[in-house]
């Protein structure tokens, strides 16, 4: 915790990253993402997250769209439910 109000310093998107919500699991290490820029993308869960970080439907994640194929993205970070609530309260996501 960063102060007494309960606000935490959260990882925010870089220039090439967007917030996204997981719509469904597509099997293996793939998910369907609804990104904040209005696009639906196929997300790939990298090996470093595959077994350590469980990603479920409805989770808020940070996604990095591919430069060469805009309809696909890598999942870079998963926010906990508490962190997602804080992002909503601060107006970063809907």
Swiss-Prot record:
Keywords, in A-Z order: Initiation factor, Protein biosynthesis
PROSITE patterns linked: IF1A, S1_IF1_TYPE
SMART domains per the UniProt record, alphabetical: eIF1a
InterPro entries: NA-bd_OB-fold, RNA-binding_domain_S1_IF1, TIF_eIF-1A, TIF_eIF-1A_CS
GO function terms (MF aspect): RNA binding; translation initiation factor activity
Keyword Protein biosynthesis tagged: yes
One cellular-component annotation, GO: cytoplasm
Keyword rRNA-binding: no
Stated family: Belongs to the eIF-1A family.
Role according to the record: Seems to be required for maximal rate of protein biosynthesis. Enhances ribosome dissociation into subunits and stabilizes the binding of the initiator Met-tRNA(I) to 40 S ribosomal subunits.
Protein name stated in the entry: Translation initiation factor 1A 2
Gene behind this protein: eIF1A2
